[in-house]
A protein has these predicted regions:
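Bacterial Sec-dependent N-terminal signal peptides
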Residues: 2-27
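Glycine- and aromatic-enriched low-complexity segments, predominantly in secreted/extracellular proteins
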Residues: 11, 141-151
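Short, structured motif recognition centered on aromatic/hydrophobic residues
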Residues: 23, 44, 83
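A broad structural signal for alpha-helix termini and local helix breaks/kinks
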Residues: 27-28, 87
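A cross-family detector of function-defining hotspots
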Residues: 32-50, 92-114
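Amphipathic N-proximal alpha-helical interface segments
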Residues: 41-68, 110-139
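Long, charged/polar, surface-exposed segments that mediate recognition or autoinhibition
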Residues: 62-95
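A short acidic/small-residue loop/turn micro-motif
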Residues: 70-72, 140-143
Length: 151
């Protein structure tokens, strides 16, 4: 849950009955369910099949999206091929997620490690199911090297 935690977040949200009912219908085997309020949405953080997930709902109880933690081999072939053509097969991967949205689209998110200008960095890639790169952001981890001058 590191990608969204702490931003506009309120713990211990009491989701309306309509929201809870929809959630239980969609994910009857979910465990460790915790409700929070994030950015104005009701969010259920839960475990499904041993993996972390989040389901997002509007104030009126309408399901908006669900984020699922997945494994590399669960990515569609087109997404794996696109990633490997751009970053190779040896790029260390930190996180992979599938995002199902209420407009019937699915987005695949890959967070991987790379080096930019000699600095360790994270690349955040979002792909459509057909392997089209939708968004690419880079977080360069610049370090403070003042300690190099300590005696």
């Amino acid at each position: 849950f590191a990608t969204l935690s702490g931003v506009g977040c309120s713990d211990d949200y009491n989701a309306p009955a309509v929201t809870r009912s929809d959630f239980e219908m969609r994910y009857p085997t979910a465990t460790h369910v915790e409700w929070e309020k994030k950015k104005g949405y009701g969010v259920a953080e839960f475990i499904l099949d041993g993996r972390e997930c989040e389901a997002w709902y509007t104030k009126s109880g309408e399901w908006v999206m669900t984020r699922f933690e997945i494994r590399y081999n669960e990515l569609p072939d087109a997404v794996r091929v696109a990633f490997e053509q751009s970053y190779g097969t040896q790029t260390p991967i930190d996180d992979i997620e599938r995002l199902e949205r209420n407009d019937n689209t699915t987005i695949y998110y890959i967070q991987a490690e790379t080096v930019v200008d000699g600095f360790p960095s994270e690349i955040n890639l979002e792909y459509s199911s057909d392997g089209t790169l939708l968004r690419n952001t880079v977080d360069v981890e610049y370090f403070d090297y003042w300690d190099d001058y300590l005696l």
